Amino acid sequence: MNALSTQSPETEVSAETIGALINLSGRQRMLSQRIVLQLLLASRGDATALDIARKCLSTFESAHSDLVTGNERFPGTFSGALQQLYFGSARADARIREFIARVRTAIDAPLADTSRQASSLDVLVTQATPILELLQTVTQAYQEEMHRCELAVRKRQTDLVDRLSGISMQANIVAMNARISAARAGEYGREFSVITQVLADIIKEMDQLIRHVVGSSDAPKGPTRA
């Protein structure tokens, strides 16, 4: 089945969630290499290596499902770019599942069947670098999603600043006209003058809010860690 033909619309995801996805996808790189290493150690007689490889595979497979399908915390392939990476020409989902199947074959190979063990292990060793490169591409894709998320947040902040600036300018004009009218009214305009002063104070607070929003959006961001 072509998953791209039934792909879901893009979902807005928070920077916090994308950060967790970056960490999860980054851990997949480490697990893939650890699995191969433990299977090599098992082939040389390490009594605990096979169990470690089996646990690593379980974690790896579960994490892949979380990344692609999603769960109560993660949204799955929430963007067109991720859907294309996993289910398009790059075939990331299929290739990762093939790696999982090959690992399971190597783990389940009978100890007495040394030729089958050696064959399945040779295939995994050959695939160690390509799968690492693929998982690196996946991690980079999530990092790009983080960059897009940050750009969207900054745009919303900029739009908010523009709206507040427009309101502040209009309010300043109203306040200035009100002061002129109060001055012309003489003694009768004193009460109105108090109201214009309150309006001026509100405008001042609004200007401070605008500066705060601008300062927050211009604050330097630390590098995203995988």
Regions found by a protein language model. Name each.
Residues 12-15, 19, 148-168, 223:
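A conserved signal-transducing helical linker
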Residues 16-47, 173:
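N-terminal extracytoplasmic segments of bacterial inner-membrane proteins
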Residues 24, 31-35, 59, 63, ...:
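Amphipathic, well-ordered alpha-helical segments in soluble domains
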Residues 32-46, 67, 71-74, 102-117, ...:
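Secondary-structure edge/capping motif, primarily at the C-terminal ends of alpha-helices
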